[in-house]
């Protein structure tokens, strides 16, 4: 297509066009759209008003382009729905008409009008008029904004050499993108090396060995073991990461990063853990069963205690794999010795999906399930001779049940290594949640993206999950990363913060509050400066600055004051 030429309208008087949408009956069923359009015609600077059944429809977009050209409009207001869903569409129409796409404002008269006042048509109509008046006042002061074109380094960094990290690396490398895989231990495999089998009985070791061989043999993957990230600079498409590899400092340039560091099982401080060699964690029992450990071979009874350290005030989350894992091991013990007495002490059984079949099989094979609540947790006693006694209050009998197991297995919480997560979070400028896991940008709309562009998350770094979900999420993260690497350049948005150094006092309040690490303090000047490639235009710095030295382009103080004045003039 021919390159579009943008008209220079910066010095022109505002000629505002207002397009009021019926949105079928979503808006027009409550709001008097004709009255809103007539009112918009009376506002200062408005030279043309249109009403449309669906302003987002393609034929309406074509009409809008013609109207902009015919009436020489240089500012546009669309009174319709949410800018979250439709702003980009209308901005593209402005570009097609030769206008800077930022000379645009949406008045959300649906979400903020008809939907929330569906039983008050008169009030909804008046509010719609207010929203349009405020939008016109703001857009009249809007100036064209420029965008930066940033080159892309077509390679990736994957942090973590577990199943998720290796899967992400292979997914990208198979598409032809060079990948550097950083693993802090001396071997790949991560948490997967401790797994005996999947929930449906498939052995993990052959799968893991094949995965490692593919990674180490892949020509596009560079594996760095005994490696630790010490510094990260840059932004999406242009990251520069320093890696310490066995004491040797290396710089890795990359366009995207996938964080797939693993987690580990909590070492509990309760239930006698560490006081007897017959008290296991689930992963330890996996190993003992696989090695035909004498403690397992001679055991006549076993007890599993669920939710150890999780679903409690300190860790309110469910680790998601513990119930299935315990029941898998209970079934293994039953297969080794069908006469063994096996008890699972639980708060809630959470065997997701087809894993429910494990629970049914365990019940059929004679595994006994005893429920307890948080206020009446089991009590474990370790005698001087190493024998175990577990006392639990049965919620049906309402009396204590005393068990004398030969084996006790604790289904402990999956937790992040907090120091590692915090350090990576600071370097990559990404958030962690209250439990210490990395936090995605949006659970449904951007489930593997961080708020910081170009950085993605997968595996246990994100949250406890089974192996197949780690693999699926790793492929999703790699696919999202590939959308960046597939481009020759990236466009940085025009709505960014700008520091007036004449007003800046160098207090660094903006540096501390910026969630994206986009503001630097210049020591020599004693002033702050915004890296516009990192800035997301959230406006936190502008609101924080005590000297009003920071302006958020597209949301200047004058524009916001104009909106407030119009809101209060009603």
Question: What is the role of each PLM region?
Answer:
Residues 1-570:
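Residues forming the flavin
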């Amino acid at each position: 297509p021919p390159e579009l030429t943008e008209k220079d309208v910066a010095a022109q008087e505002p000629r505002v066009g207002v397009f009021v949408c019926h949105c079928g009956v979503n808006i027009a069923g409550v709001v008097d759209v004709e009255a809103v359009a007539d009112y918009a015609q009376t506002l200062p600077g408005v030279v043309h008003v249109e009403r449309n059944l669906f302003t987002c429809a393609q034929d309406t977009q074509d009409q809008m382009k013609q109207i902009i050209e015919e009436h020489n409009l240089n500012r546009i207001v669309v009174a319709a729905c949410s800018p979250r869903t439709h702003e980009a569409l209308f901005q593209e129409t402005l570009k097609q008409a030769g206008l800077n796409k930022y000379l645009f404002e949406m008045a959300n008269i649906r979400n903020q009008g008809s939907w929330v006042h569906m039983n008050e048509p008169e009030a909804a109509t008046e509010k719609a008029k207010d929203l349009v008046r405020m939008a016109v006042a703001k857009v009249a002061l809007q100036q064209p904004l420029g965008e930066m074109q940033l080159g892309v380094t077509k390679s990736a960094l994957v942090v973590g050499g577990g199943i998720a990290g290796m899967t992400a690396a292979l997914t990208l490398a198979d598409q032809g993108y060079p990948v550097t895989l950083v693993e802090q231990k001396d071997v790949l495999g991560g948490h997967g090396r401790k797994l005996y089998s999947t929930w449906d009985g498939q052995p993990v070791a052959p799968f893991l060995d094949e995965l490692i061989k593919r990674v180490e043999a892949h020509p596009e993957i560079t594996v760095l073991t005994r490696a630790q990230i010490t510094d990260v600079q840059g932004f999406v498409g242009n990251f520069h990461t320093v890696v310490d590899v066995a004491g040797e400092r290396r710089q890795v340039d990359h366009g995207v990063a996938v964080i797939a560091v693993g987690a580990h099982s909590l070492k509990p401080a309760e239930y006698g853990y560490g006081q007897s060699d017959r008290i296991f964690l689930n992963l330890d029992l996996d190993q003992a069963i696989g090695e035909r450990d004498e403690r397992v071979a001679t055991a006549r009874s076993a007890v599993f205690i669920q939710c150890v350290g999780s679903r409690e005030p300190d860790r309110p989350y469910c680790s998601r794999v513990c119930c299935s894992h315990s029941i898998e091991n209970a079934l293994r013990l039953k297969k080794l010795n069908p006469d063994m007495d096996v008890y699972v002490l639980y708060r809630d059984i959470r065997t997701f999906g087809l894993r429910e079949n494990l629970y049914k099989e365990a019940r059929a094979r004679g595994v006994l399930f005893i429920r307890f609540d948080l206020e009446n947790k089991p009590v474990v006693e370790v005698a001087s001779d190493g024998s175990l006694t577990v006392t639990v209050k049965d919620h049906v009998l309402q009396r204590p049940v005393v068990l004398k197991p030969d084996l006790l297995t604790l289904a402990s919480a999956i937790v992040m290594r907090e120091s590692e997560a915090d350090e990576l979070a600071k370097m990559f400028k990404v958030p962690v949640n209250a439990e210490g896991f990395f936090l995605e940008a949006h659970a449904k709309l951007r489930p593997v993206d961080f708020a910081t562009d170009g950085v993605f998350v997968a595996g246990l770094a994100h949250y406890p999950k089974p192996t197949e979900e780690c693999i699926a999420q790793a492929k999703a993260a790699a696919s999202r990363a590939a959308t960046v690497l597939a481009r020759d350049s990236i466009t940085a948005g025009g709505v960014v913060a700008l520091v007036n150094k004449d007003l800046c006092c160098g207090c660094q309040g903006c540096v501390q509050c910026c969630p994206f690490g986009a503001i630097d303090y210049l020591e020599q000047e004693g002033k702050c400066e915004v890296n516009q490639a990192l800035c997301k235009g959230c406006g936190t710095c502008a609101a924080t600055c005590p000297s009003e030295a920071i302006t958020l382009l597209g949301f200047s103080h004058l524009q916001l004051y104009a909106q407030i004045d119009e809101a209060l003039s009603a």
